[in-house]
Amino acid sequence: NKILFPLSQIKDSSKELINKIFVLSKMLSKTNYKLVIKPHPNFSIKKILRTNSNLLSSNISISNQSVDELLDKCYFSVFMATGAAYNAILKGSIAFTLESELNLADNYLDIFQDKNKYLESHDLVSLKNLLIELKNDKNKLIDYQNEFLKLRTTLINGFNQANNERLEIFGNFKHGN
């Protein structure tokens, strides 16, 4: 039961997510969930980890494997301010957005909320409760799988494909009409 946490190249978002991972690891310590941190290739987390090394616990690991390799191994993924959320959906992961206390617009999946369930942002308590619920309720887990499969299909098929109507609107806009 691995949960992937890909970090953003945005320094503040990555710091915030790392701090939330430390808290969530304690909240999930009595479960068999393993939290996997994937550093962004453009952002070193060594200094943050040195400063907070006492917060690392046995259910947290750090991996430098590619996001795609990790998504193959992690059933769930949790994001804050990174487009890797789309990679996760395309790889079949159930993706959760963690609320930021610094930035209100960090949910990369909110543009799909009108046609898909389960894309709201979570605070740590609601995420912990949901992860435990999904572990214990197979029907709820299947419902989540189906919703994310639907979103995956939307992404694969192109959620904003060109068609005659859109091309006409674009043409009118381009020509100042």
Language-model segments: which ranges?
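Short, surface-exposed amphipathic charged segments that create phosphate/polyanion-binding patches used
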Residues: N1-L4, D72-A81, E133-K138
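Conserved catalytic-core segment of nucleotide-activated headgroup transferases in glycan assembly
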Residues: N1-T51
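Residues at the C-termini of beta-strands that transition into short coil/loop
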Residues: L7, P39, S66, E99, ...
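Donor nucleotide-activated moiety binding/catalytic core segment of transferases
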Residues: P41-K91
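Catalytic binding pocket for nucleotide-activated donors in carbohydrate/polymer assembly enzymes
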Residues: N52-N54, G83-I156
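CheY-like receiver
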Residues: L70-K73, L130, I169
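C-terminal alpha-helical cap of glycosyltransferases
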Residues: L155-N177
